[in-house]
Amino acid sequence: MAVYTNLNKNLKKNEKKVSISIILPIIAVLAVIPLITYKYEYYTHLETFDWYRGRPQAADFFLHYKTIALIIVSIYMVLAIIYMVWGEERKFVWDKKFIPLAVYAVITLVSAIASKNSYFSFNGIYEQFEPVWILMGYAVIAYYCFYVLRDETTVKHTIRWFIAGISVMAALGLSQVFKCDFLRSDLGMKLITPPPHEKLTFNFELGRSYLTLYNPNYVGYYATLIVPLLIALVFTTKKLWHRIGYAFLAASLVLILFSSQSRAGIV
């Protein structure tokens, strides 16, 4: 009986480890990648175009490394699906609703290959680091979530990490709302710039929230996606202190939304 109990405990531990490894890329997409902010200097490759009036060299803080991370996560997801299907012999699940998404991914790749400016299709362009790999990655992420998030336990584990990421983002946003922007502090600048750390000039006025999302308008999209989830959790969670926490996060994001002056989110 004792042996059976120990074996049962070991099996549960192994299942938990496998569960964490499976939801890890989803956690990265929901909670980690949105926070990535770091300086990246690059050549625009646009100087040959008559319509471009900017400098040949530019700097990015909010998009490039998010792009790299998302591509890595997408590759991880593909490998994880292959392992689960062939290594663990899980049943491959498919739904006809994904056919349009698969067609979109294929057309996107063909379009990138056929483009006269394929360099930008595969590497991204000035202030728009969204190459074809990212567009195809969105399709991979959508299917992976459909394949993995199929039971209540997995969803609960994922939401916990998602809430952690939202909490960090809300804390950063509140610092911007109350004109104590963490990214403008000495420590914040050291975290987002390579040595030697330089003093940065921000395009957004002090008191306007932008989180780590490049454009204050993106704050509107972020808030309108997250707030309904938090409100739903307020009404479905049993523990009182959880409800209070979710309500506080929802209220914080609404405040951050108005501070961002994002018409997209308010509308």
Report each predicted region and the residues it spans.
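Interfacial loop-to-helix junctions that mark the boundaries of transmembrane helices
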Residues: 50-69, 91-96, 125-129
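Interfacial helix-loop-helix linkers and transmembrane-helix boundary segments
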Residues: 89-94, 149-158
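Aromatic-anchored transmembrane helix interface
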Residues: 122-147
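Juxtamembrane membrane-water interface segments that cap and precede transmembrane helices
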Residues: 45-63, 118-121, 197-212
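Canonical alpha-helical transmembrane segments
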Residues: 60-63, 75-89
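Membrane-interfacial, low-structure loops and terminal tails that flank and connect transmembrane helices
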Residues: 1-16, 88-94
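Interfacial/capping segments of alpha-helical transmembrane domains
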Residues: 41-52, 182-191
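Alpha-helical transmembrane segments of multi-pass inner-membrane proteins
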Residues: 2-7, 14, 21-36, 69-83, ...
